[in-house]
Amino acid sequence: MSVIPMFPLGSVLLPGEHLPLHIFEPRYQALVHECLKQDDPSFGVVLIARGHEAGGGDVRHDVATTAHIIGHEAIGSGRYLLECVGGERIRIDAWLPDDPYPLADVRPWHDEDSESMIDDTEFDTTWARVEDLYELIGQLEATENIASPGFPDFLGLPISAAEKIWSLAALIPMGQSDRLDILSAPNVRARKTALDDAIENVTAVVQFRLQP
């Protein structure tokens, strides 16, 4: 276990996902200042359960992701523009008093069953569901005159099933609750089930919006 700085957000950061941040609150300016002294500047990102990002007083979940700072720019008055990427999943054992930014005692949360691997062929149904979803999203774009997210590049996805799930979850426009379910799944097989459920949820929302 180790104590690390934490950044509560209104969104879930998934492993491998890129996260741009504009740091303007003084307490998080201090967090970044301290992080940049490290060889591998990083902090934890956790979803806020209740409350708001700014001002403190929020209630937070107990599963999080490390965020590695891969680029930063000081833009004056102590503010920063950061480019971060999600690292490993972590479990929060205890929250410490803010000093001045949130701190937590955390430990890595590895998959609980290394034997629960899945084969590439098990993604066939998932691919079909994603294709159906994006066809519906295209219809929604035409009827509501909105910009739809680009279709995921399946050929560009990682080879391993575990990384493929993280990448797909980051690409599909799902809600934060679904993203949290995927992050909180105990192993790869459960994570794929959570991903499939999330795709169904998004599909149901789009179908509802397409109703006359």
What does each model-found stretch correspond to?
Residues M1-P212:
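N-terminal low-complexity, acidic/polar interaction/targeting segments
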